[in-house]
Amino acid sequence: MSRRNKNGPKLELRLNLSPPPSQASQMSLVRSPNRSNTTSPSSCVSSETNQEENETITSMVLVGCPRCLMYVMLSDDDPKCPKCKSTVLLDFLQENAFAATTATAANTRRKKKTWWN
């Protein structure tokens, strides 16, 4: 049985990012006499600095939800699937768990003996 449905809807994943501004456009913004030195309260720059002062930096984890079959990046403080709210998540990028699993697998491979050895 094929997993692809040829008549089904196509999934289009596209990330549109604007390129960084050139140095010439940045210099014109700095030299503009009409601009004030402070940012407006609704500006994203001013809100970012306010958030940095009020919040501590939290680490993010990349996990997979076995119920929804999707990967999400979540805060390490409260990891819950945003879709189904499940707390059973697979953290497959955790370095310590990966190293321990790899070392255990390597040891079991070394212990196996074949008839020609």
From Swiss-Prot:
GO biological process, one term: root hair cell development
Statement: the UniProt record of this protein carries the keyword DNA repair: no
Compartments where found: Nucleus
UniProt note: phenotype after gene disruption: No visible phenotype under normal growth conditions, but the double mutant seedlings gir1 and gir2 exhibit excessive root hair formation.
Biased composition (Low complexity): 31-49
Region of interest: Disordered: 1-56
Function as written in the Swiss-Prot or TrEMBL entry: Acts as a negative regulator of root hair development redundantly with GIR1. GIR1 and GIR2 may function as adapter proteins that associate with GL2 and participate in the control of root hair formation. GIR1 and GIR2 may function as adapter proteins that associate with TPL and participate in the repression of root gene expression.
UniProt name for this protein: Protein GL2-INTERACTING REPRESSOR 2
Gene expressing this chain: GIR2
